[in-house]
Amino acid sequence: SAKDIKPNAVKIGMLHSKNVIQAIIKSLDKIKTKKIVLDPVMVAKGGTKLVNNTSIIYMKNKLIKKVLLLTPNIPEAEILTKTKIFSIKDMIKAGKILISLGVKNVLIKGGHLESKQINDILLNKKTIKIFRSKKYYSKNTHGTGCSLSSAIATNLSCGKDLFKSCDLGIKYVNEAIKSNINFGEGNGPINHLNSFTINKRFKQ
């Protein structure tokens, strides 16, 4: 438990209800680490809303101010800012709105934009950084957002600064998409073990 092994960083994923958010806030107030990453999961890949409006409002008013980094994708950023995003300029505008709401740092993920490359934008009150990477087309992309926020939190826990943690996290997820493995039919997960080398004698 967190009482026994103190966390160096915390990653928070989908929060379905106001009660869950209240419990999370209470827990965060008890721990010392400020390296908290929130992935505000709100919309399924098909566009279905996963969180009710009461929870979204409570998250905006109470939780997002407590985290070091918020990592919305474009549909989530649109919900949080009540704007439409069609370009990098729109992403920056949405990021500035989130900063004005009390967010310390926001990484808006640009994978939903129609382009040959992905532009992920990291903003705070002082700086704007754009991470540009090649877009890999694959049906196996389940878990990209969750994996990215987890990778960033992991790098933060290892002592990396925020910029480096985001950079390494983005590169990790890109490689996991690029090297994906097919599991059965339909959309599968990214390859989280892409950096591992498997000894030939264990391969069938």
Which residues are covered by each model-predicted region?
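Conserved N-terminal subdomain of the carbohydrate kinase-like
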Residues: 1-45, 49, 196-198
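Short, small-residue alpha-helix embedded
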Residues: 79, 138-162
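Short pre-catalytic strand/loop immediately N-terminal to key active-site residues, enriched for Gly-Thr
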Residues: 128-142
